[in-house]
């Protein structure tokens, strides 16, 4: 590989660049921690039990509103329904999203609903083993409080009940609630309307065993999760700022490559591809979701993230391979197919899984791959295969890193005996590799640490008088960090434009044919290499 | 308004009762008025409570409807005891004169009623029945509360609002009077509110890229009210008898060897009356006529329940439902079974 900027940069300049990047890093953490609210909000809803007195099943369904001027006729509990001889098929659970005096906003980006049943224990009406609930659900929307509701989705879904009764099953404990698992219910990929309405029925069909053996359902609870509007605004602003930054460095990088007389080497191409994928994930296409009802934004975001991660993992493999100094086969992508296949295959499995889940939800928001046995097995299979590919990749990467370090230590012992040109070349390779290894490990460690913190902590800390949103800081900080990583990579590993010294001709005269393949360029600079560079060279000599 | 003669008699009797006796926690009475809550006609509400009643009529309806819930829980917890949390519908005060005494039972009733109001309001908020739950109306589409705007960072949980409102409403009367009983009620009301909060479960959901835990959202879910009732029942069993300290600002344990009460304990001043005998002065109705369990060894055994006065046995033939098949919600098909059982009831005092 040709000499990169990082080798020729003075220590002073390198430190200045590092400090600037650190300041941007701290700023990106603070934007999330201090300005943005928490990433998501959860609102609890308790379904209202409405009575459908219409006996006919006409084409246009009537919509039952739990509150407001045209609210439905309600029952408080099912003892009341028993007394009035109301049938199960005439009970409609009605949920209005959002709560009174609030409006949904396009800034919320998605709406995820989770279902929980309150089922009371009764000795003579227990939950059968392996029971599943059949749910007939309709979703409607309107954009002002006086409009008619417009149907958006309708589906008949099944969900498996998984309930435990922790107390003894005695008559004294009748009326106590089972401990039931949460059930996935609905996911909308965009929130384009202000008001949503859900009407849910639990139809009973004794002959077909529909909703038989589900126990005594007292209530239906939903939890609505959406992205906070403030977080969305901060996130979009960050993306809008980062896109031109990475784009500019990408253009500059390409100009540097094209200015050279030789064609770009594989590593330079891979770095450029990494910049493209980073820009692709940065482009704030989400701004369109504020104006358009595009439900595929979530899926599109997932795909972009997948592309970036695949490219990043491939870059690490190729970077290691290109720094194996004794390898005669290099600068060709075909050399790395063994290591890249696990990345591609694992990414493909996750892509299929995402299409099976979020892709189907574009048509039917109530679909969940976990609701059926076949779906659960398929999902687990895809996830397991992706996990195996991740492990394989990790082993390959560790092995290659090990090889590079062994190569480095072998080469270091030979450094004093080399000619000056060869020694400078190898020292440059060693410095480049160690620098990137250090920075990559730091970024990966930071990502893992913050992931663990966000799982364990409550989500916000009180710091002085301010509330620090740790989860938001995690998102903006880590996102900013990887952008800075790619930025620094393209800047520092761009080819240097320094002139070659006089040693080139002498190297040609004294070098043998075997070593010539290793020496594509030589490095000279009037300022000399950085202090770190000198120390590594001196250490090698000792 | 034009009252019918029986209406006039009703209000006259209410007025007479109001003047003739002191009324505690008059808001309990709202349940007996049904959905027709008339703030000015509930005896014993102080001005602040009446004002809140007028400002939030739907809240009052929800509270009235929820009274049945916590009374049922109270009666469940004490179903096998001499005092069984019975209410007297014909009295203007639900529990009669029983709560005039600063007893253990009064402490429990105040705590569970406070907890019941929090529970009821939280449910009403989740159903959307109340308008000003956790986001006060501001500009269009930008409702906000102390936590911030709904469309920026979301609003508080419903339970936080319910606790605040319950505290303001229930404690208004006690804060107006500065005597020992008021302090006791304030303490027990707060213990009840904390009991509900104690059983909020933190539930989390992982979502994000491919369902990984890239994003995780948590919320507080309210548990079964029975758990709160069980907890307060344990607190009742371990309630602490206290006296006022010399400054009149707090409590000291009545017996030096016992621990001082903390915020979760129930406190009381006076020993309980003898619930065995009917005593108009203390409000005890006695255990005469109560059904007891001859084979039990607990508090519902005939020996304990009847206070040693003996019991009557009668053979009763009754029709029960058996071999029931349930359909969810609203239908049950059963066979009728005939059986004869012995019913034991306590003798009345002679």
UniProtKB/Swiss-Prot annotation, chain B:
One of its GO terms (cellular component) is extracellular space. Coiled coil: none annotated. Residues 1-25 form the signal peptide. GO terms for molecular function: cytokine activity; frizzled binding. It holds the Pfam family wnt. Disulfide bonds join 74-85, 125-133, 135-155, 204-218, 206-213, 276-307, 292-302, 306-346, 322-337, 324-334, 329-330. Keywords: Developmental protein, Disulfide bond, Extracellular matrix, Glycoprotein, Lipoprotein, Secreted, Signal, Wnt signaling pathway. Palmitoleoylation is required for efficient binding to frizzled receptors. Depalmitoleoylation leads to Wnt signaling pathway inhibition. PROSITE patterns: WNT1 (PS00246). InterPro entries: Wnt (IPR005817), Wnt2 (IPR009140), Wnt_C (IPR043158), Wnt_CS (IPR018161). Belongs to the Wnt family. PANTHER family: PROTEIN WNT-2 (PTHR12027:SF86), WNT RELATED (PTHR12027). Ligand for members of the frizzled family of seven transmembrane receptors. Functions in the canonical Wnt signaling pathway that results in activation of transcription factors of the TCF/LEF family. This is Protein Wnt-2. It comes from Danio rerio. The lineage of its organism: Eukaryota, Metazoa, Chordata, Craniata, Vertebrata.
């Amino acid at each position: 590989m040709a000499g990169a900027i990082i080798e020729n940069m003075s220590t002073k300049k390198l430190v200045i660049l590092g400090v600037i990047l650190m300041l941007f890093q701290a700023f990106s953490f603070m934007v999330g921690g201090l300005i943005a609210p928490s990433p998501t909000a959860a609102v609890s809803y308790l379904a209202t039990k409405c009575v459908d007195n219409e006996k006919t099943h006409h084409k246009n369904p009537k919509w039952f509103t739990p509150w407001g001027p045209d609210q439905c006729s309600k029952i408080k509990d099912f003892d009341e329904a028993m007394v009035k001889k109301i049938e199960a098929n005439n009970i409609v659970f009605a949920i209005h999203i959002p709560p009174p005096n609030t409006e949904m906003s396009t800034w919320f980006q998605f709406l995820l609903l989770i279902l929980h049943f309150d089922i009371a224990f009764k000795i003579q009406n227990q939950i059968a083993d392996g029971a599943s609930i059949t749910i007939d659900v309709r979703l409607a929307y309107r954009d002002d409080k006086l409009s008619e509701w417009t149907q958006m989705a309708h589906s008949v879904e099944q969900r498996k009940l998984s309930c435990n009764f922790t107390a003894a099953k005695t008559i004294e404990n009748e009326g106590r609630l089972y401990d039931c698992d949460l059930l996935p219910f609905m996911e909308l990929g965009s929130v384009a309307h202000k008001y949503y309405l859900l009407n849910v029925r639990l139809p009973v069909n004794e002959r077909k065993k529909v909703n038989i053996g589900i126990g005594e359902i007292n209530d239906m609870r939903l939890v609505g999760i959406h992205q906070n509007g403030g977080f969305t605004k901060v996130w979009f602003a960050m993306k809008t700022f980062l896109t031109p930054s990475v784009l500019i460095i990408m253009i500059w990088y390409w100009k540097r490559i094209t200015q050279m007389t030789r064609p770009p080497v594989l590593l330079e191409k891979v770095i450029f591809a990494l910049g493209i994928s980073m820009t692709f994930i940065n482009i704030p296409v989400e701004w369109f979701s504020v104006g358009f009802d595009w439900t595929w934004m979530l899926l599109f975001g997932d795909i972009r993230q997948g592309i970036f991660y695949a490219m990043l993992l491939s870059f690490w493999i190729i970077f290691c391979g290109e720094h194996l100094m004794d390898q005669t086969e290099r600068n060709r992508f075909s050399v790395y197919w063994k290591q890249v296949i696990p990345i591609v295959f694992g990414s493909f499995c996750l892509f299929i899984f995402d299409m099976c889940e979020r892709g189907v939800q574009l048509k039917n928001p109530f679909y969940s791959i976990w609701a059926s046995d076949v779906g659960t097995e398929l999902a687990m299979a895809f996830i397991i295969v992706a996990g195996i590919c991740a492990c394989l990749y990790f082993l390959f990467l560790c092995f290659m890193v090990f090889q590079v370090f062994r190569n480095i230590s072998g080469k270091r012992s030979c450094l004093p005996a080399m000619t000056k040109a060869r020694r400078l070349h190898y020292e440059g390779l060693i410095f480049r590799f160690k620098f990137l290894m250090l920075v990559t490990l730091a970024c990966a460690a930071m990502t893992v640490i913050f992931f663990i913190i966000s799982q364990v902590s409550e989500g916000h800390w009180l710091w002085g008088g301010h509330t620090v949103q740790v989860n938001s800081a995690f998102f903006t900080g880590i996102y900013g960090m990887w952008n800075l990583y790619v930025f620094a990579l393209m800047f520092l590993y761009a080819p240097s434009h320094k002139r070659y010294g006089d040693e080139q001709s002498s190297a040609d005269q004294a070098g043998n044919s075997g070593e010539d393949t290793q020496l594509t360029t030589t490095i000279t600079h009037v300022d000399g290499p950085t202090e770190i560079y000198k120390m590594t060279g001196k250490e090698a000599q000792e | 308004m034009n009252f019918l003669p029986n209406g006039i008699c009703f209000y006259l009797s209410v007025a007479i009762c109001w003047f003739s006796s002191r009324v505690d926690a008059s808001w309990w009475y709202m349940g007996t008025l049904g959905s027709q809550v008339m703030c000015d006609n509930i005896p014993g509400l102080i001005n602040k409570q009446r004002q809140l009643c007028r400002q939030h009529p739907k809240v009052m309806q929800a509270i009235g409807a929820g009274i049945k819930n916590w009374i049922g829980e109270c009666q469940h917890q004490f179903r096998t005891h001499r005092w069984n949390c019975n209410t007297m519908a014909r009295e203007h005060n639900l529990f009669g004169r029983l709560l005039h005494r600063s007893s253990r039972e009064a402490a429990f009733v105040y705590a569970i009623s406070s907890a019941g109001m929090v529970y009821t309001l939280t449910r009403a908020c989740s159903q959307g029945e109340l308008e000003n739950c956790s986001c006060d109306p501001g500009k269009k589409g930008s409702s906000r509360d102390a936590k911030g705007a709904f469309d920026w960072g979301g609003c508080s949980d419903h339970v936080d609002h319910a606790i605040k409102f319950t505290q303001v409403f229930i404690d208004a009367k006690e804060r107006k009077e500065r005597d020992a009983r008021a302090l006791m009620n304030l303490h027990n009301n707060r213990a009840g509110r904390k009991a509900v909060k104690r059983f909020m479960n933190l539930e989390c959901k992982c979502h994000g890229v491919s369902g990984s835990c890239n994003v995780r959202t948590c919320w507080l879910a309210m548990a079964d009210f029975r758990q709160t009732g069980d907890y307060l029942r344990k607190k009742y069993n371990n309630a602490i008898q206290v006296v006022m300290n010399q400054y009149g600002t707090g409590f000291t344990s009545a017996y030096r060897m016992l621990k001082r009460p903390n915020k979760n304990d129930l406190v009381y001043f006076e020993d309980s009356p003898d619930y065995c005998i009917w005593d108009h002065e203390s409000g005890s109705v006695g255990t005469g006529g109560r059904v007891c369990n001859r084979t039990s060894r607990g508090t519902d055994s005939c020996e304990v329940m009847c206070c040693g006065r003996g019991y009557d046995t009668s053979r009763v033939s009754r029709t029960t439902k058996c071999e029931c098949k349930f359909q969810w919600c609203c239908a049950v098909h059963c066979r009728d079974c005939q059986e004869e059982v012995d019913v034991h009831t306590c003798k009345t005092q002679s």
